[in-house]
Regions:
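Structural alpha/beta core scaffold segments of enzyme domains
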Residues: 1-238
């Protein structure tokens, strides 16, 4: 957490994509690695190759591969702000300077900014391997339609006779409403600290209510045993 200070701890900073959709042609971290005080620079290539599967990540089920690609972009940046590289240095100022020395070559791809545009048949596809799942009601895995699209899941829920309801209604109002992204706005400064001991055990301090979800995701993405990971929840404000 933000209040945790350990002897000799390193500080991390993240380089993020300025583009909403772009192919990553190359990442050169050599200058950043050579900067005095920088201890490590990581990209997606430093992650182990993992067998993709669906896991329960505390509040929802998700693809392990897609979770890993969200942590650090693999072949493409999928949204503006997508993490591209991470720097660990002896202080935050050096880490920030190191970010400026990382050279990323992008091929900018077409992008859309609304859900309606993203669901059109001719929309640019973000996940090349994503196919739409169809299911009736919200539970169960559903059936794979085999259709490559930006729609992860099409859930059909039917209750009663809607046409009969329209006929019997005194007034029918049809409108479409959209809002901006809303966050619950917790008040504590969010941070995560980790210590990987020489005996192979990893301890993580973070502001979370889902310690087992954090442990499971870390285990799956880093390909280490859950028994070697300990997650300690910190103060949560808000």
């Amino acid at each position: 957490g933000a209040d945790l200070v350990m002897a000799g701890q390193l500080h991390g900073r993240i380089l993020r994509s300025p583009h909403a959709h772009a192919r990553i042609l190359s990442i050169d971290t050599s200058k950043a690695e050579a900067l005095e005080g920088v201890m490590a620079v990581a990209t997606a290539k430093d992650f182990p190759v993992i067998q993709d599967r669906i896991l329960d990540f505390a509040e929802s089920q998700s693809s392990v591969r897609m979770q890993a690609e969200n942590l650090l972009a693999h072949d493409k940046a999928l949204y503006q702000g997508h993490a591209i590289a991470a720097v660990a240095a002896i202080n935050p100022h050096i880490a920030e300077e190191a970010l400026k020395l990382i050279d990323v070559e992008f091929e900018v791809l077409p992008s859309v900014i609304t859900a309606d545009e993203a669901m059109k048949e001719d929309a640019p596809i973000l996940h090349d391997s994503l196919t739409t799942m169809f299911k009736v009601d919200r539970f169960g895995a559903g059936d794979n339609t085999g259709v490559n699209s930006n729609i992860a899941s099409h859930v059909q829920i039917t209750r009663g006779d809607i046409q009969q309801g329209f006929k019997e209604a005194d007034l029918v109002i049809e409108r479409s409403f959209t809002t901006q992204t809303v966050h619950q706005g917790y008040i504590e400064p969010f941070a995560c600290s980790a210590q990987w001991s020489t005996d192979g055990h990893l301890t993580i301090w973070c502001s979370t209510q889902a310690i087992f979800g954090i442990r499971g995701a870390t285990s799956a993405i880093l390909n280490i045993a859950e028994s070697d990971i300990k997650v300690i929840p910190m103060e949560i404000g808000g």
